[in-house]
Amino acid sequence: MIENENHSLRDRVSDLEKKVHEQNDEIMCLRSTLADVLRRLSTVEGASRVSNSHSIGRATPTKEAGIRLRHQNNDIRDSSKRASSYVPGRSTSTSHISRRGAHYQSTSSLYSDGHSSSSVSPAPSPSPTHAQAHTPTVHHHHHHAPSPTAHHHHARHTTLASPARSGPVGALNKRWASTSDFATPSRVGHAHSPTPTNSQLARRPNSGSLHNLTTLRSATSQLNLGRHGAREAQYNPDEGVVKLYLRGRPLNLYVPTALQETYSPTASTAHPPAKLKLEWVYGYRGRDCRNNVYQLPTGEIVYFVAAVVVLYNVEDQMQRHYLGHTDDIKSLAVHPNKLLIATGQTAGHDRRDARPHIRVWDSVSLNTLHIIGISDIERSVACLAFSKADGGSLLVAVDEAPDHNMSVWDWSRGERGYKMLETKCSADQVLAVDFSPVDRSTIITCGKNHISFWSYESGMLAKRMGIFENRERPKYVTSISFTDAGNVISGDSNGNLLIWQRGGNTVSKMVRGAHDGPVFSIYVQKDGAIITGGKDGRIVEWDRELERTGNIIEVPEQYGSPRVVTSGRGSQLVVGTTRNCVLEGTFTFPMRPVMQGHTEELWALTPHPGHHQFLTAGYDRICYLWDTMAHTIVWSKDIGEHAQSAAFSSNGEIVIIGTTSGRWFVMDAETREMYSQHQDGNEPIQVLKFSPNGQYLSVGSRDNNIYVYQVSEDCRKYTRIGRCQGHASFVTHLDWSADSQFLQSNSGDYELLYWNAGLCRQIVQTSQMRDVEWASNSCTLTFATLGIWPEGADGTDVNTCAKANNSGLLATGDDFGKVKLFSSPACHQKARCLEYGGHSSHVTSVGFLHDDSRLITTGGRDTAVMQWVVSPTSPSASQR
């Protein structure tokens, strides 16, 4: 009876939560409608004031109009009611609605033949079918896209104001009928055939199938892509200027003279003449995850980083990738048959579109078999395990939410599985969960202040806490495993190992000081030998009785401590470490890294100007030079400071590293010798750019200034020419002109300024710069990048962009983990693009290799570096 009442209570609470979410959406609609009315009233008044002297296309809100509006607060509600009484027109979305959707891929979409990536070729964004407008040919030499700091991009803003459009008062005849207007794909052109939203699907546990998830993902993807374009852009053909509004702030973008007569912001654009395919992922998530490295019968090591599961064949030097997840993967479990894999993810940026869930998939075909827990998991899947005694018919998962709920699933029943049991696991953090290999009904969990022994019978879970008796109780039980007899072995934060007798909850044996610090991993081999890994950097072998065999591996400090230890090929061990490395080795032969990665937030990226190499640097103080052909690290160097930006000299012999302290280093790109260091202010060096002729270096700082240096002595000597002052906020991006005379720069308050580099003076007559040819296009706010901005963008969504050297492509990275590929220049609204997932954090930098054969992207907090092959498409495909 109590259980039924609790179940009914949970259902009622769930219904109330749904209503609250819906009401929040309605409130957002009302706020947006109100802002829309204010903006449109301002536009109408501005248009009437200048109608006798200017065309209506140039009408913008005036300061006086804004002042008058502030005195009309009493009329706001009436205006809002009038606006909402009309027939619904095209809805205006807010920035949070255009965030990434829940990309639940179908089983077929994840198929990968051979060793190729499972990266899915995305559907191109819809666009009108008009002829493509003529665009000029642009030559460029640099492709590094400096990025702003994390603080700027972590602050999220919701754009409530709709665009200021000129036109009759009838333009006000628009409203939102309900919250569904925000999420349905009707704006794409199917107003009379709405499709369920991801959030609606997630709220209906029994609605639909994998096919429905696929259809939904496709519709949502097309919707998001169709929204591309600066919705508030207005074109004045008389002056040849496009006015773009970001968070209500106008930005004038001047159209090149050759395009003024034929340019239209809404003209149709071609698909990019190439597509991307994920080739290689550098990195591994071991710093804060456990039990996430395994050897498969295919000879591949499986692990994850960001939103990608990597299947890496070390011997053949090939990677495959499972790309079904939409945000950070936090847990991984391998089925007893060694072919099926379950992975769990965290909640995404938009909780409705990227809800935490578990995916069960085939490691051979990369087909998704089941999607579990979409409406049941609150925060993220902290740990996972398949049952062993019954051949893996059950799956247990622990939620990372405050209650740390544990749920047991019959995962193969239906496409969404069947939840058999759920209970609160612990008030404290849970670090691991596992089934007994001999007792189907026994589950063990461990974590902060506890080890718990669970048994389930007749639909009930019974819990017994581990009893330490007179032994020291550890603060954390950090790892668990089972002997072949079913006894539990646990490791704790005190460095002790304990054996718990099968069926009991008391300690039968204890080994003190097995490690100097926490025991992170316990692995029992087929012959009964036990291998442990600890924070002390040691891997120790024990016999069945927990007596040392004398075999010890000391993992070098540079690789970190062993986070997980498992069996590899033959007698080899595979080790995942706390410094995001994957190692292979034996007790006889030393450990060697098969994968290394950054350990902290990553911002600096610069491709080599002449080789298939690129350099990355991050807040972990480490610089890596990577080889894209061998997929290896050429060299690494600890610079001793948090790195923010980097740039290769034109000849590739020198690399400049900018730090968060305002210091930047001059380093030999081959020997790693430090030639000199310089200090420009005390704020982070956001951007570093060499001029095309190699004679100047521009340094963009968070102190709002751009410092210009004369370069001499083969790029080893730097003499400051001056400082460009004029930005009201920190510098985010820089570009040199092709003739090395001018600079263009963006700032944190959405400015686009131009500079005479030799004089360090601002060029106030910006219209004079409309025909300047730019060597690169890393500035995100320019005429050539007008089309990269989604509707409702708040100016911080797009972090980075880079123009290809010779292939007419433009790549961008945004706050939602998406990499997008456009045709260059992307100077029209609703510019068509191809969108790719994989990163789970904001994409901080993108850059093409010197021959445009590959695109390199870096994630911020996900610390991942991804390498994409750029493959040309047929002309007919790019024109469709």
Report residues per predicted region.
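WD40-repeat beta-propeller superdomains and closely related acidic/aromatic-rich repeat-like regions
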Residues: A202-R880
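Non-transmembrane coiled-coil alpha-helices
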Residues: I2, N6-L9, V13-L16, V20-Q23, ...
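Intrinsically disordered, low-complexity segments enriched in polar/charged small residues
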Residues: E17, N24, M28, D36, ...
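Intrinsically disordered, low-complexity acidic/Ser/Pro-rich regulatory regions in eukaryotic proteins
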Residues: M1-H7, R40-Y245
